[in-house]
């Protein structure tokens, strides 16, 4: 097999593969045997028709067609391996030459155009030192958590005064465009100052009492008229203020397993410290990946990027075609970073010769299945059927490579070595492989299967 590679772009190549007759013959023989199982030829038992008879009765073109369909993907994979090309998308095949008869010496020739991972020269990581922040737990952090817990036990009490920031108003909303009502809602509970609904609503409600109403101009953020300006009428039905419990031992015993407020605060501080250490580990991960990319120009495959941006926009707006410039720019920035991170981690896994075992992949997929409440074996079969197994293997490899790389690096905070063993040990490896980033490919299939199950239940 002769393989030539032409670089079309830094991330796109065109392979031309020429196959010798003796390499194609096994595929032709296999095609004849498969066809023999499907046809009836007088004088021969089904499945036992000689190849020459198949060529004569069915036609060599049919044999060659089936052989080429089987041969091209397999030979393409061998060509990628031989030339050390790492594809990032499905190829575009163009079969140019095919033998027309059993005696035809014409060689099978095809091209494959595919987006690939660019060559990435990673720095040596042994002995590398990376500075990160020192985890801190301030009194304000404890106070914020304590206040959040306190708010969970708060009650809403009606007040006879104008609404102010922090109050909860029960409101009716009506939106009009050119005098026509396009949307309305009644009995909506809204916290003033939360800015979780229409822009301008907080300002409109500030100072209104129960029974009063006003209008303001706002941009609709959902529905058929998303993005359009509308005149919004808002009426206040009632105003309630949040009444919080007093911070004392009684509150501590009611809100937690502790008898005193001091014990509760100590536990909150401990939890805050653990969270701070977790954030430090995340910072270390991000700093490590950034260090690997330092000084490198890493091009991004255009087609892969376009597809990922489209998927990103689907999660940002109901109609991606109506996405704003800001949304498109945000999606492109996110996708480019994700792609560069993925490509760097793939290169790192290769550099460190990371091996992904069958049990690694099974444990990874089983953890995703568990999150979705699905049978692991059924889920894994679905992953295979949907062609996602390769993606799962790749994700596990990235995770293992990342952890192995971070173990080889020294992280420091204020000049002191940081011990990240709790996050980089074997247990952490399991947790990392279950992360949202690593689970993306498998979770997509899980969503699809869950949707199908819901549809069946609805029937």
Swiss-Prot record:
Its EC number is 5.2.1.8. It catalyses: [protein]-peptidylproline (omega=180) = [protein]-peptidylproline (omega=0). Keywords: Cell cycle, Cell division, Chaperone, Cytoplasm, Isomerase, Rotamase. GO terms for biological process: 'de novo' cotranslational protein folding; cell division; chaperone-mediated protein folding; protein transport; protein unfolding. It is found in: Cytoplasm. GO terms for molecular function: peptidyl-prolyl cis-trans isomerase activity; protein folding chaperone; ribosome binding. It is an enzyme of class 5 (isomerase). GO terms for cellular component: cytoplasm. InterPro entries: PPIase_dom_sf (IPR046357), PPIase_FKBP_dom (IPR001179), Trig_fac (IPR005215), Trigger_fac_C (IPR008880), Trigger_fac_C_sf (IPR037041), Trigger_fac_ribosome-bd_bac (IPR008881), Trigger_fac_ribosome-bd_sf (IPR036611), Trigger_fact/SurA_dom_sf (IPR027304). It comes from the Bacteria. Residues 166-245 form the PPIase FKBP-type domain. Gene3D superfamilies: 3.10.50.40, Trigger factor ribosome-binding domain (3.30.70.1050), Trigger factor, C-terminal domain (1.10.3120.10). The keyword Cell division applies. Involved in protein export. Acts as a chaperone by maintaining the newly synthesized protein in an open conformation. Functions as a peptidyl-prolyl cis-trans isomerase. Consists of 3 domains; the N-terminus binds the ribosome, the middle domain has PPIase activity, while the C-terminus has intrinsic chaperone activity on its own. HAMAP family: Trigger_factor_Tig. Belongs to the FKBP-type PPIase family. Tig subfamily. This is Trigger factor.
